[in-house]
Amino acid sequence: MKLPISQRLLACCDYVSPGAVVADVGCDHGYLSIHLLETGLARQVYASDIRPGPLDSAVKNANKYGVSQHISFYLSDGVQALPRDFDTLVCAGMGADVMISILEKAPWLRDERYRLILQCQSKTPMLRRYLSQTGWTIRREQVLRDGRFLYTVLEAFWGPGEPLTPGQCYVSPALLSGKAPLLPEYIAWVRDHLGLSVNHKSNPDPWETEAYQELCALEEGL
């Protein structure tokens, strides 16, 4: 039977190295976990959710698709209840504030053994800024369309990197280097939304203003 998995989740799976031990935090119905095991990308998955309902659904789906022997389920706030022997943390479909809270509550993740795969639903510049300021380096990032909307998926490693400028918090160097077909559309969309904020305030935020100026210059150079 065909797994009803979204393009956003498939894009997250593309960044998982074969044979990984994955923590799928905010697993919802478990589709990402199931796909990783069906395709052999993960050899073990720790699936967690803070809500009992979605977690129960994930358990049922794992049994339905025959992969339950390789998934352990946890009712957990972020990674708090999970074993620490995974190597890849996937968070998909959350806002930046939730992802940042998860990372802040688990300082032990700041270790080279872990990598993050993050698909942010809102306030993505806030997430990029946080990662840059706390020692994470965005190694890869891609933009994709799922339905009517554009999303990004990023991969981050713990370790030193060049601090992001305000504009790079909106369009990261990793995203630019990928040269995805949707990149110009994404940059224009981000610039338009940021412009609404900057141009309609009597006292615009200096950080947002600098970011907007960077994005306008970036568009001119494309």
What are these regions (language model features)?
Residues 3-19:
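Conserved alpha-helix/loop element of class I SAM-dependent methyltransferases that forms part
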Residues 19-28:
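Conserved class I S-adenosyl-L-methionine
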Residues 30, 34:
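Glycine-rich SAM-binding Motif I of class I
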Residues 44-49:
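Conserved SAM-binding motif I beta-strand of class I
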Residues 51-53:
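Conserved SAM/SAH-binding beta-strand->alpha-helix loop
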Residues 56-84:
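S-adenosyl-L-methionine
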Residues 105-155:
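C-terminal substrate-binding/active-site "lid" region of AdoMet-derived donor-dependent transferases
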Residues 159-160, 166-222:
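An accessory alpha-helical subdomain
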